[in-house]
Every structure is written in structure tokens, then in C-alpha cells.
Amino acid sequence: MSKRKLTQNQKRRIQSNNEKTLHRHQRREKKEIDWQDDMLGESQDGIVVTRYSVHADVEDAAGEIFRCNLRRTLSSLVVGDRVIWRKGNAQLQGVSGVIEAIKPRQNEIARPDYYDGLKVIAANIDRIIIVSSVLPTLSLNIIDRYLVICENAQIPAVIVVNKVDLLSDQERAEVEAQLRIYQQIGYQTLMISALSGENMEKLTALFDEGTSIFVGQSGVGKSSLINHILPEVNAQVGDISENSGLGQHTTTSSRLYHLRQGGQLIDSPGIREFGLWHLDQEQITRGYREFQYFLGTCKFRDCKHLNDPGCALREAMEQGKIHSVRFANYHRLIASLEETKSQRHFSSEN
């Protein structure tokens, strides 16, 4: 007799319960290695390069990394956070110090979590690099989802399409036409191949300064790109699932890497469903930068931008000022948002 498959909600509930149990256990362990004040040195600046459940790896001004405990007063800590920490006079169970405070963030990138609300992934980002792939097919809808996040966080975005060595001449022309949609509204795009090396120098040049973060679904080749940019890191590369074309998750924790040319790179775990249900319709609408000029000019204040009479957005689309693909993706995103919120409301009542 075959086992009954679990629903996605059941899987998320099981995962959440496991994580909470592990967190409680690690909290108990942490109490055993709390530092006394006279065991700690002077306060110093640092940056979080990796965050674990109750610990974090902090890099000091000299580039040395120390595993630290977190003060219980710290409500949130993520990769990229600039912190005040103190080094211990000795190591205790592999822990070398304590993080005492988080400096104000320049910005943050977050995704919704079904059980814990909004979960911040990284902080103090100068550039978000959206990595997509032509395998199994290039999804503009997924790209638009990431761009909505970027626009709401007010962080510049670069669209990178990987594995273009797999394209025929005709397919390449089609992808180039798709990317022109984004170039025309001011986004930088780049077609690359980690395998053949095409345009990898241009990709590497993006990291000359500032802190960048790779985002993208599993299987798009983020780990392969890191291996090319930082060969000494040797990030684990996952195999593509033969059934879905999506890769297995290969990065378990977000991590910040320093690049030889001076910038930093944050690699985050693959996200198959980058939910946007924490955003309302107005935030989604403002996540489409080419809509900005026309917002507030519709005939009716409560215009849904569908078939409403006097809709400035639809008129702009019909005149070619807004691309029809982006306009269709916008409505697809709004519809999926309403459906997801309805399902969450139903689930919370049962």
C-alpha cells in the first residue's frame, strides 16, 4: 500500500515544528555557554557573514571570522548586518564572542513565511542580481515577482539569464527580444553562460564595489556562478531534477563572500516560491516602475486597471507605452495574490 502524499501545508507545518524543536534545544545549549562580562574584550565593529539558529559568524576589521553567540535582546540578525560585538578571552564550545547590538540597516530584503510572518533574508544590499535560466524555460512572470520585491525595497536590480549556451540561434533571438522589454524600462540585463564563460567578465565587473545578492529559483545555476567568480569557495552544485527541471537546494544558509575586486556577494538559499502575499495591491502596482507615470490619472480612484472605463494604465498599454506582457503579468500576479490570501484565510480557520 503506497503512502499518502503530504500536502504543501502539511509539509510546511512539519518543517516549522521541527525547526521550533531544534531552536528550543539550541537555546538550552546556549544557556550553558553564556559569557560573563569579565570574559569579554572591548567592543568592536563587525559584519555578519553567516547566520545560524542561535549563532552567527562575524568578520572583524582585519577580515578574520569568529563564531559568536547572540544577546537575547537581539530580535533579528541576518547576513549583511553591521554589528557591535566583543571577542572572548577564550573559546567556549567553539564560540569566540558575543554580538551585542545591530547597527541601523540601510535596507533589507525579506520574504513571507507561512508561520513566522515576514522573514528578512539579508541587509544592507547595494544590488540584487536576479538569476534566471533558459532551462526549462525563461519565465518573465518569475522575473517580475523578484522585481516587485526590488522596487519595494528600493534596491537596484540586474537581470541575469544563465545557460544561454543551450539556446539555438532562433531561441537566442527570442530571449533577447524578451530582455529588451526590461532594457526599455531601465533595467540592466545580461545573458551569460557559466559553462562556456560567455559574458562572465561583465558579470564579475558588477561586483567591483558594494554588496550584491544573488536571488533566483533552484536550478538556475547560482552555485555554478559562485564557483566561477570565487573558485576557492567551491560551492556545492546541485543536480537538476529530471522530473521538474528544478534543482535541489544546495545552499542551506545565506553567506557573504568577499571578492578580489573589492565588492561583496551574498548567496541565499534557492527560493522556489517567492511569495508576495505580504504586499497589498498598491505595493504590487508600484513594483512596476513603468506604471509610476500613469498612477493617479485613472478616471476612478478605485480603478482595478482591468476593464474599468478611463483606466490610464490600460490606455498606456494599448498605446504601447506599457508592454502587454508586463501588463498581463501584473494582473496574473494580482490574481494569484488574492487566491493565496484567500487560501491562507481559509487555512487559518480550519
Swiss-Prot record:
Gene Ontology CC: one annotated term: cytoplasm
CDD domains given in the database record: YjeQ_EngC
Gene: rsgA
Chain sites annotated for binding Zn(2+): C298, C303, H305, C311
EC annotation from Swiss-Prot or TrEMBL: 3.6.1.-
UniProt entry tagged with the keyword RNA-binding: yes
Compartment(s) where it occurs, according to its Swiss-Prot or TrEMBL record: Cytoplasm
Protein's GO biological process: ribosomal small subunit biogenesis
Designated name of the protein: Small ribosomal subunit biogenesis GTPase RsgA
Quaternary structure (record): Monomer. Associates with 30S ribosomal subunit, binds 16S rRNA.
PANTHER family for this protein: SMALL RIBOSOMAL SUBUNIT BIOGENESIS GTPASE RSGA, SMALL RIBOSOMAL SUBUNIT BIOGENESIS GTPASE RSGA 1, MITOCHONDRIAL-RELATED
Binding site for GTP: N162, K163, V164, D165, G216, Q217, S218, G219, V220, G221, K222, S223, S224
Bias (Basic residues): 1-14
GO molecular function term, any single one: rRNA binding
Keywords from the named record: Cytoplasm, GTP-binding, Hydrolase, Metal-binding, Nucleotide-binding, Ribosome biogenesis, RNA-binding, rRNA-binding, Zinc
Cofactor binding: number and manner: Binds 1 zinc ion per subunit.
Region (Disordered): 1-32
Catalytic class of the enzyme: hydrolase
Tree of life domain: Bacteria
